[in-house]
């Protein structure tokens, strides 16, 4: 539940899921007869600071960066920011420093236009030109298609493509910064975001929380 921050680990068939509430991993290829370790990070705006507190404890217990221990890291909204940074190899303390630097600037902006502009600026400052081929483990960034009210999930591995292996492009060819901006754009507090895919399609997106504030089920589907 929003406001309650806890780490739980459960078995789900062949998957092992660690879900951090108020806040989701898959190597590029992994044997299907092995368990897939999933880290699921849900949305909650500035509550991402609580999520980072829980993740710091998990990282300390594991004694290694989280991307090395999770095969799939899925995130929605503020959880998408954390998921992307972890999957790129950042340690939790590094993510926390970035949060302290950028999140207050976004949240303190008054209008939708100002919030959207600051979110875009921060996303591009942090992620620059990084693409989904640059991550170190499996990732899923959840956004929502505005017109269809259905999820659009940015992934990095063909293992997550289900029946679309032939046409799969990591992240649909969209930069990580743009995917993060889309996943965090909670309309009407933020403006809708239009992304352009590698196939030339322009898709209008909003916050992933409108379809799955907790992306665990999507992650499990990709792991099976």
How would you label these PLM feature ranges?
Residues 43-44, 208:
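Glycine-rich Rossmann-fold phosphate-binding loop(s) that bind the pyrophosphate
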Residues 41-42, 142:
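Short hydrophobic segments within beta-strands
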Residues 18, 32-40, 46-127, 166, ...:
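Patatin-like phospholipase
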Residues 24-31, 62-67, 124-139, 194:
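Surface-exposed acidic, glycine-flexible loop patches that form ligand/cofactor-binding
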Residues 134-224:
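Active-site gating loop/helix substructures
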Residues 11-22, 45-52, 172-189:
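An acidic intrinsically disordered interaction segment
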Residues 1-32:
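Cytosolic, low-complexity regulatory segments enriched in Ser/Pro/Gly with interspersed Lys/Arg
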């Amino acid at each position: 539940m929003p406001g309650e921050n806890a780490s739980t680990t459960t078995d789900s068939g062949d998957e092992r899921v660690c879900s951090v509430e108020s806040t989701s991993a898959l190597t590029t290829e992994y044997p299907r007869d092995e368990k897939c370790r999933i880290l699921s990070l849900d949305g909650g705006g500035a509550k991402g600071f609580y999520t980072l507190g829980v993740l710091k404890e998990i990282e300390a217990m594991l004694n290694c960066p989280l991307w090395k221990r999770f095969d799939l890291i899925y995130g929605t909204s503020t959880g998408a920011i954390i998921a992307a940074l972890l999957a790129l190899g950042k340690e939790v303390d590094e993510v926390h420093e970035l949060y302290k630097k950028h999140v207050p600037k976004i949240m303190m902006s008054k209008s939708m236009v100002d919030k959207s502009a600051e979110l875009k600026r921060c996303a591009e400052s942090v992620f620059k030109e990084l693409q989904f081929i640059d991550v170190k483990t499996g990732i899923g960034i959840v956004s929502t298609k505005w017109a269809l009210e259905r999820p659009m999930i940015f992934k990095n591995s063909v293992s997550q493509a289900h029946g679309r292996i032939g046409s799969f492009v990591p992240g649909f060819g969209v930069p990580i910064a743009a995917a993060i901006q889309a996943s965090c754009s909670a309309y009407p507090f933020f403006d809708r975001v239009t992304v352009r895919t590698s196939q030339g399609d322009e898709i209008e997106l909003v916050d992933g929380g409108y379809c799955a504030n907790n992306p665990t089920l999507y992650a499990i589907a990709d792991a099976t």
